[in-house]
Curated annotation (Swiss-Prot):
It comes from the Eukaryota. Keywords: Chloroplast, mRNA processing, Plastid, RNA-binding, tRNA processing. One of its GO terms (molecular function) is RNA binding. The keyword tRNA processing applies. PANTHER family: MATURASE K. It comes from Plantago argentea (Silver plantain). One of its GO terms (cellular component) is chloroplast. Pfam families: Intron_maturas2 (PF01348), MatK_N (PF01824). It is found in: Plastid, Chloroplast. This is Maturase K. Usually encoded in the trnK tRNA gene intron. Probably assists in splicing its own and other chloroplast group II introns. The keyword Hydrolase does not apply. GO terms for biological process: mRNA processing; RNA splicing; tRNA processing.
C-alpha cells in the first residue's frame, strides 16, 4: 500500500494543469456553444420570461466580455448593482451563463486527458464493450443477481447545497488555483441571482451535469474502496472511475474521524458480507445484499455518517429506505422492479407413480409505471390527466407525413424502451393513446372527425406508419405469427438505447421514465 501511495503522489506532482488562460480564448466559447446541450446560451434579447436567450447567438458578446475581463478586477465588483457591474458588463445574468458554459468545456480537458491515458492499450476491450453501453444492460444484471438477494437499500444521493463543496471536490482534479478561484466567483454570481430570475433562465445543463458527476465520482471512489475492504470478494473492475482520488490519505481520516478507530480494516470486518451489489443511475442508487435486515440497517447508518462527516452534508437516514425485495417495488431507470415469488408446478414420475410438486421461484419483474407515463404524455398534450387521447394543436399545421412520422418516432422509442416489461398491458395502453392522438391531430387539421377521416384515408392508413417491429414481423411472416407472438409477449431488452430525449419535439423533451 505504501508503494502505491508513493506512486500516486509522484503522479500528482507531475501534473501541471494550467487552465486559467483558456478562459480568455474566444474559440473555447465557440466550441462550448456548439457542444452545448441547450445550444442557446448566447442571445441578444434576454427579455422574454419563458424563452430567455432564444434569439440568434453572436460571439460579439464573448469578445466584449473577454475585453472587460482583461481590464477589470472581478474582486472589485460593486454589490449594490444587481443588474450590471464592472466585471460582468451589461448583463450579469447572460455573462454568468457564458462563463459557466465556457468553464465547463475547459475543465473537462484534464478529465479527457486522464481518460485517454488510462485507456491506452485497451482498445480491444473498448470496442468490444461498445455494444453494452445501453441503459438496458442493467436489467439483465438485475435478473441474474437480484433473484438471489433479500434486501435492498433505495438511496437518493444528496446534492451539495454549497458551492464550496463542489470546488473542494474539483481541486483533486484541477491543479490550477486561479481556475478554482474563478469557478468559486462564477458560482457565487450565479447563485446570487433571485429565484424568479433563475426560473426564467435556461439552466446550464452541461456545466451542472459536470459538477454533479464529479461529485458522485468522488463519492463512489471512496465508497467502492471501503466496500472492497469489508467484503470477502473484491470488485474485479470498476470502469466508471478514472482515478482513485486520494484513497489512502482519506482512509486515515475516515479511520480516526468517521469510524472512530484507527484500524479501518478491523472495524469494517464487523460487517463482512460476501454478496453485495451496487447500481447507480442518475441521482438514485440501489445497494442490495443477501444479509439480514439488521445488516442492512448497519449499512444505512454507515452511509448516512459517511456523507455527513466526509462531505459535510446533512444526510437524513430517511433518504435511504430499507425494503425486502419480495414485496417492494423498486422505482429505477423508468421501471418498477421487484423480485417476487412465482408459483411453478412440476410433474414428477417415479416408476409408475406420478405426482405434482409446487415450487416457488423468485423472478425479477419489471413493470411500466403507468401513472407517471400518463402524466408525462398529458404534459406533452397527447392526452389529459385521465389518459384520454387528445389532439396535438401545435402539430396541426404540419404536413400529414410529418405528423405521422413524429408520432411514429415517439411510439417506436417507447415500445423499444419498455419492451422488457413483464406485463405488456400498460404498453398497449400507451401505444393506444399515441395512435388515437395522432388520428385526432390529423382530423383536427382536416377539420373532420376521427371516424370520417379514417374512413376517407382507409383503415390501414396509420398502421403502415405506426407499426412496431414485432407487428411488422408477424405481418411479413404470417405462418410463423404464433411463434413470433410468443416472442413479442416476452421480454426484449434493446441494447442500443443510451438515452431518449427527443420524444416530443425540438423545444420540450418528453422523458417518460422519470
Amino acid at each position: 500500500m505504501e508503494e502505491i501511495q508513493r506512486d500516486l503522489q509522484l503522479e500528482r506532482s507531475r501534473q501541471q494543469d494550467f487552465l486559467y488562460p483558456l478562459i480568455f480564448q474566444e474559440y473555447i466559447y465557440a466550441f462550448a456553444h456548439d457542444r452545448s446541450l441547450s445550444r442557446s446560451f448566447l442571445s441578444e434579447n434576454p427579455d422574454s420570461e419563458n424563452q430567455v436567450y432564444e434569439n440568434k447567438s453572436s460571439l460579439l458578446i464573448v469578445k466584449r466580455l473577454i475585453t472587460r475581463m482583461h481590464k477589470q478586477n472581478h474582486f472589485l465588483i460593486s454589490t449594490n448593482d444587481s443588474k450590471k457591474n464592472l466585471f460582468l458588463g451589461r448583463n450579469k445574468d447572460l455573462d454568468s451563463l457564458i462563463l459557466l458554459e465556457g468553464f465547463a468545456f475547459i475543465v473537462e480537458i484534464p478529465y479527457s486527458l486522464r481518460l485517454i491515458s488510462s485507456l491506452e492499450g485497451k482498445r480491444k476491450k473498448i470496442e468490444k464493450s461498445q455494444t453494452l453501453r445501453s441503459i438496458h444492460s442493467i436489467f439483465p444484471f438485475l435478473e441474474d443477481n437480484f433473484s438471489h438477494l433479500n434486501f435492498v437499500l433505495d438511496i437518493l444521493i444528496p446534492y451539495p447545497v454549497h458551492a464550496e463543496i463542489l470546488v473542494q471536490t474539483l481541486r483533486y482534479w484541477v491543479k490550477d488555483a486561479p481556475s478554482l478561484h474563478f469557478l468559486r466567483x462564477x458560482l457565487n454570481d450565479y447563485w446570487s441571482l433571485s429565484t424568479p430570475k433563475k426560473a426564467g433562465l435556461k439552466r446550464n445543463q452541461r456545466f451542472f451535469l459536470f459538477l454533479y458527476n464529479s461529485h458522485v465520482c468522488e463519492y463512489e471512489s471512496i465508497f467502492v474502496f471501503l466496500r472492497n475492504q469489508s467484503s470477502h470478494l473484491q470488485s474485479l473492475s470498476f470502469g466508471v472511475l478514472l482515478e482513485r482520488i486520494y484513497f489512502y490519505g482519506k482512509i486515515e481520516c475516515l479511520g480516526s474521524v468517521f469510524l472512530k478507530v484507527t484500524d479501518c480494516q478491523a472495524n469494517l470486518w464487523l460487517v463482512k458480507e460476501p454478496c453485495m451489489h451496487y447500481v447507480r443511475y442518475q441521482r438514485k442508487c440501489i445497494l442490495s445484499s443477501k444479509g439480514t435486515s439488521l445488516f442492512m440497517n448497519k449499512w444505512k447508518c454507515y452511509l448516512a455518517t459517511f456523507w455527513q462527516w466526509h462531505f459535510s452534508l446533512w444526510f437524513h437516514p430517511r433518504r435511504i429506505s430499507t425494503n425486502p425485495l419480495y414485496n417492494h417495488l423498486l422505482e429505477f431507470v423508468g421501471y418498477l422492479s421487484s423480485a417476487r415469488m412465482h408459483p411453478a408446478m412440476v410433474r414428477s414420475q417415479i416408476l409408475e407413480n406420478s405426482f405434482l410438486i409446487n415450487n416457488a421461484i423468485k423472478k425479477v419483474d419489471a413493470l411500466i409505471p403507468i401513472m407517471p407515463m400518463v402524466t408525462s404524455l398529458a404534459k406533452a398534450q397527447f392526452c389529459n390527466l385521465l389518459g384520454h387521447p387528445t389532439s396535438k394543436p401545435v402539430w396541426a399545421d404540419l404536413s400529414d407525413s410529418n405528423i405521422i412520422n413524429r408520432f411514429g418516432h415517439i411510439c417506436r422509442n417507447i415500445s423499444h424502451y419498455y419492451s422488457g416489461s413483464s406485463k405488456k398491458k400498460s404498453l398497449y395502453r400507451i401505444k393506444y393513446i399515441l395512435r388515437l392522438s395522432c388520428a385526432r391531430t390529423l382530423a383536427r387539421k382536416h377539420k373532420s372527425t376521427v371516424r370520417t377521416f379514417l374512413k376517407t384515408a382507409g383503415s390501414g392508413f396509420l398502421e403502415e406508419f405506426l407499426m412496431s417491429e414485432e407487428d411488422l414481423l408477424c405481418w411479413t411472416f404470417p405462418k410463423a405469427s404464433s411463434a413470433l407472438w410468443g416472442v413479442y409477449k416476452s421480454r426484449i431488452w434493446h441494447l442500443d438505447i443510451i438515452w431518449i430525449n427527443d420524444l416530443a419535439n425540438h423545444k420540450k423533451n418528453l422523458r417518460p421514465w422519470k
